[in-house]
């Protein structure tokens, strides 16, 4: 697994000294324990000596991410890059080490700091169909969370969702449709809009274009670049090849 980094243009407020990292990973490790099944436990009663299998997915990762940067994590399948992305997004807690967001250790955050972290770091998944609730309409997929978290009033949800759909290149008239009524590229745009809906500062892209046709990949990568400029986003982009990163890397 390798990491590439694109830095944002220097800003006036950085002249006085080094800016505090927006996101910092310190000694991150993640292990998954596969417990023995029933047959293995029975065999142990007979003296077999079987043990649970431990998968060491991530081992000792240190990383600092400044606001506005784009970090590319590239590696072969199974190297732990997606697991690292999930740790950053708070989906999987690390086995060892810690994540800091805006200078605050996530292990000791107050409730308000925890909410800012959970809303401020969003994730876009590789398989758009699997990551969208098939029983929910697009207007609710995108608009439910910002209403629940008080970012938008319920009465303004439809307007808010329509604006987000336009930003990602979707017709707002499709807001009442279900995920299965869209193409793969359109479903991924829904996933992008859902992430944007919570007004994040960091977006983790977990092979976000890997499941799309090559022509659609280019369109979605260009969209990421546009959204980065519009919303001052920071990206942590996971991919099995650097070929899906160049468009994002323009600074």
Predicted regions and their residues:
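Conserved ABC ATPase "signature" region
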Residues: 40-47, 105, 156-173
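ABC ATPase NBD coupling module
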Residues: 49-52, 93, 106-122, 140, ...
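Helix-to-loop junction immediately C-terminal to a conserved catalytic motif
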Residues: 89
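Conserved ABC transporter NBD signature motif
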Residues: 97-105
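A short, proline-enriched helix->beta-strand linker immediately N-terminal to the Walker B motif
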Residues: 197-201, 217
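Single conserved hydrophobic/aromatic residue that forms the stacking wall/gate
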Residues: 242-251
């Amino acid at each position: 697994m390798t990491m590439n980094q694109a830095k944002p243009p220097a800003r006036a407020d950085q002249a006085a000294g080094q800016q505090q990292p927006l996101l910092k990973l310190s000694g991150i490790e993640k292990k998954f324990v596969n417990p023995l099944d029933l047959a293995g436990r029975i065999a142990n009663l007979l003296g077999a000596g079987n043990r649970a299998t431990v998968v060491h997915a991530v081992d000792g990762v240190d990383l600092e991410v400044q606001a506005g940067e784009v970090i590319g994590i590239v590696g072969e399948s199974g190297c732990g890059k997606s697991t690292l992305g999930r740790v950053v997004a708070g989906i999987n807690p690390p086995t060892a080490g810690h994540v800091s967001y805006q200078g605050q250790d996530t292990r000791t955050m107050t409730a308000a700091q925890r909410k800012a972290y959970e809303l401020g770091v969003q994730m876009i998944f590789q398989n758009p169909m699997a990551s969208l609730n098939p029983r929910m309409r697009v207007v609710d997929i995108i608009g439910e969370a910002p209403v629940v978290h008080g970012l938008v009033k319920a009465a303004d949800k439809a307007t808010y969702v329509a604006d987000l759909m336009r930003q990602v290149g979707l017709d707002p008239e499709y807001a009442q449709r279900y995920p299965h009524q869209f193409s793969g590229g359109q479903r991924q745009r829904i996933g992008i809009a859902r992430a944007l809906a919570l007004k994040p500062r960091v977006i983790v892209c977990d092979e976000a274009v890997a499941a799309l046709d090559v022509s659609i990949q280019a369109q979605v990568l260009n969209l990421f670049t546009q959204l980065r400029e519009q919303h001052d986003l920071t990206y942590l982009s996971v991919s099995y090849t650097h070929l899906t990163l160049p468009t994002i890397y323009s600074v």
